[in-house]
Regions:
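An amphipathic alpha-helix/helix-turn recognition signal
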Residues: 18, 57, 61, 83-87
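Phosphate-binding glycine-rich loop
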Residues: 32-77, 91-93, 101-103
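N-terminal "arm"/small-domain region of PLP-dependent enzymes with the aminotransferase-like
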Residues: 1-30
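Aromatic-acidic/polar surface patches that form glycan- and anion
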Residues: 10-13, 32, 55, 109
Length: 122
């Protein structure tokens, strides 16, 4: 195949480029900095004043922490979309649980609700 078909075309607009350049210019590339602090404070204010908000480095880290906080442990089964990047399932394995992959609908690419129901009842 000579021509790549992108599922989602890569794109970075002017705003993203500005913030990336600002991070390099101020040497706040990782792990934290004023943009992360502003994001956390803004999200905390939007959601609630009584809870803490923490920005993480990736969706994988967020799923990992969510599984731990939900009490998922070794031997548990966790339903997982089959049409995904491996990083969606890796945290399930990190906590010792078993990913159970649910296939997608061909017209939406979303998890098939019928197959989801079957997996829950199984």
């Amino acid at each position: 195949m000579k021509k790549k078909i992108w599922l989602s075309s890569p794109h970075m607009g002017g705003t993203e480029q500005k913030y990336v350049q600002e991070a390099f210019d101020t040497n706040w590339v990782a792990p934290l900095g004023p943009n992360v602090n502003e994001f956390e404070n803004g999200l905390q204010g939007y959601l609630t004043k009584n809870k803490q908000v923490t920005a993480l480095s990736s969706g994988t880290a967020a799923i990992h922490i969510a599984l731990i906080l939900a009490g998922v442990t070794k031997g548990d089964e966790v339903l997982c979309q089959s049409f995904t990047f491996s990083a969606s399932a890796n945290p399930i394995v990190y906590v010792g649980a078993k990913p159970v992959f649910i296939d997608s609908e061909s017209d939406t690419w979303n998890m098939c609700p019928v197959l989801l129901e079957n997996a829950i009842l199984d």
